[in-house]
Curated annotation (Swiss-Prot):
Role according to the record: Participates in chromosomal partition during cell division. May act via the formation of a condensin-like complex containing Smc and ScpB that pull DNA away from mid-cell into both cell halves.
Keywords: Cell cycle, Cell division, Chromosome partition, Cytoplasm
Subcellular location per the Swiss-Prot or TrEMBL entry: Cytoplasm
Designated gene of the protein: scpA
Quaternary data: Component of a cohesin-like complex composed of ScpA, ScpB and the Smc homodimer, in which ScpA and ScpB bind to the head domain of Smc. The presence of the three proteins is required for the association of the complex with DNA.
InterPro entries for this protein: ScpA, ScpA-like_C
Alphabetical GO biological process terms: cell division; chromosome segregation; DNA replication
Organism of this sequence: Desulfitobacterium hafniense (strain Y51)
Protein name: Segregation and condensation protein A
Record family assignment: Belongs to the ScpA family.
Length: 261
């Protein structure tokens, strides 16, 4: 959601959300859940659905563009809500118990939240890289002596992002498990794991070998760990030409471990 938004409540109505535009229906839904201050694994589906529909109607009243994606998600929320409100049939021991109807929605929200965090981190790296200023020096003479200051020198952000998306797509093609579980691997642990693997390959480690995992969330956490290492300057990426494989290299800072690492 864009900065500068505000939310007001009136009696017995859903919140009135003022903002220029959401980045998409999942952005709106995530905002409403955060506004409720509830666990993403325990979404109050009836209340959140009513609020989502209210905001979509508000967008229409303000002549804002309501894309098909918003309407599709609104319909899906209504379907999930109806499954909660309908009386549950008498349990039949011969029939396998139906799972939580919110399960797929939670999976999508978790993935969206991780992607959003990754995009924000990439933006911070791009901004910080653009704010570096240098005195006029013999650049050619110094270039061979120092690691480039920009950890993504010669690489477009889109190339790194598209490489990550390709790995996600390959993982989803073979992913069959649909259970929703909290992240088992803390980002701090994954940062150390990724850094150690890069250090073991001083001549460069392929991006596709570094960002790995059997589950989509493991791959996402690995990518977030790489972004953290790029921000800290402990690794840098290189790409010989467009559409070629991206390689990750350790920098001098890579060996600056703390006692806890």
């Amino acid at each position: 959601m864009s900065n500068g938004s505000s939310v007001s409540h009136s009696a017995n109505t859903a919140p009135y959300v003022e903002l220029p535009a959401f980045q998409g229906p999942m952005d709106l839904l995530l905002h409403l859940i955060q506004q409720e201050k509830v666990d993403i694994y325990d979404i109050p589906i009836a209340r959140i659905t009513d609020q989502f529909i209210q905001v979509v109607r508000q967008m229409e009243d303000l002549d804002m563009e309501v894309t098909t994606e918003f309407l599709v998600l609104a319909a899906q929320l209504l379907q999930i809500k109806s499954r909660y409100l309908l009386p549950k049939p008498v349990k039949d021991v011969t029939v396998e118990e139906e799972g939580d109807p919110r399960q797929e929605l939670v999976e999508r929200l978790l993935a969206y939240r991780a992607f959003k965090q990754a995009a924000e981190t990439l933006g911070e790296i791009q901004i910080s890289s653009g704010q570096r200023y240098f005195r006029e020096v013999d650049v050619d003479g110094l270039r061979s002596q120092f690691t480039p200051a920009d950890p993504l020198a010669g690489i477009h952000f889109e190339a790194l992002w598209h490489a990550f998306q390709r790995i996600i797509e390959r993982a989803e093609q073979g992913e069959e498990i649909r259970t929703v579980e909290p992240d088992e691997i803390p980002i701090e642990v994954m940062v150390n794991d990724v850094l150690r693997r890069v250090i073991l390959h001083p001549r460069g480690l392929r991006f596709s070998q570094l960002i790995r995992g059997t589950k989509r969330m493991e791959i996402i956490v690995s990518f977030l760990a790489l972004l953290e290492l790029l921000k800290s300057g402990k690794v840098h990426c290189e790409q010989s030409s467009q559409n070629e494989e991206i390689f990750v290299f350790p920098t001098e800072k890579a060996w600056e471990f703390t006692e806890g690492e």
